[in-house]
């Protein structure tokens, strides 16, 4: 492959890296925490990010404590 072709390939790979969506490696560390129902019993629906599933999953939250991987709505956890 010519040096021009290599430069083009390098440029395209760099552009792809910059434009790809945020991956799980770039997520804050709290996304690695498991869903935590907490000790209270005011059960309500919440969402958490599952690194194993690579998606947001609904779970039942007790209403207090828990951890930072806990969102009220799907929209909230995607932002």
Swiss-Prot record:
SMART domains: KU. Its main location: secreted. It comes from the Eukaryota. GO terms for molecular function: serine-type endopeptidase inhibitor activity. The keyword Secreted applies. Gene3D superfamilies: Pancreatic trypsin inhibitor Kunitz domain. GO terms for cellular component: extracellular region. Coiled coil: none annotated. Disulfide bonds join 40-64. Residues 1-24 form the signal peptide. It is found in: Secreted. Residues 31-79 form the BPTI/Kunitz inhibitor domain. Keywords: Disulfide bond, Protease inhibitor, Secreted, Serine protease inhibitor, Signal. Serine protease inhibitor. This is Scutellin-5.
């Amino acid at each position: 492959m010519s040096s021009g072709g290599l430069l083009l390939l390098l440029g395209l790979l760099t552009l792809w890296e910059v434009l790809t969506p945020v991956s799980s490696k770039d997520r804050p560390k709290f996304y690695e925490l498991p869903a935590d129902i907490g000790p209270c019993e005011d059960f309500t629906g919440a969402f958490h990010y599952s690194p194993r599933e690579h998606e947001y999953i609904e779970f039942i939250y007790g209403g207090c404590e828990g951890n930072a991987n806990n969102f009220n709505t799907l929209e909230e956890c995607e932002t």
